[in-house]
Amino acid sequence: HSQGMFTNDYSKYLEEKLAQEFVEWLKNGKS
């Protein structure tokens, strides 16, 4: 099992999570 693979998947997951939270934050700020 490659450490780099895990790190890559994890950072991808974090980016998606952050993007979703950012969109929610934008929605809440605009309304």
Swiss-Prot record:
Gene Ontology terms for molecular function: hormone activity
Source organism of the structure: Huso dauricus
Entry-linked Pfam families: Hormone_2 (PF00123)
Entry similarity comment: Belongs to the glucagon family.
Protein name as annotated: Glucagon-5
Localization of this protein: Secreted
Listed Gene3D superfamilies: 6.10.250.590
Keyword rRNA processing part of the UniProt annotation: no
GO CC terms of this entry: extracellular region
Disulphide-bridged cysteine pairs: none
UniProt keyword terms in alphabetical order: Hormone, Secreted
Annotated PANTHER family: GLUCAGON, PRO-GLUCAGON
PROSITE patterns membership: GLUCAGON
Cited SMART domains: GLUCA
Function: Glucagon plays a key role in glucose metabolism and homeostasis. Regulates blood glucose by increasing gluconeogenesis and decreasing glycolysis.
InterPro entries, sorted: Glucagon, Glucagon_GIP_secretin_VIP
Induction: Produced in the A cells of the islets of Langerhans in response to a drop in blood sugar concentration.
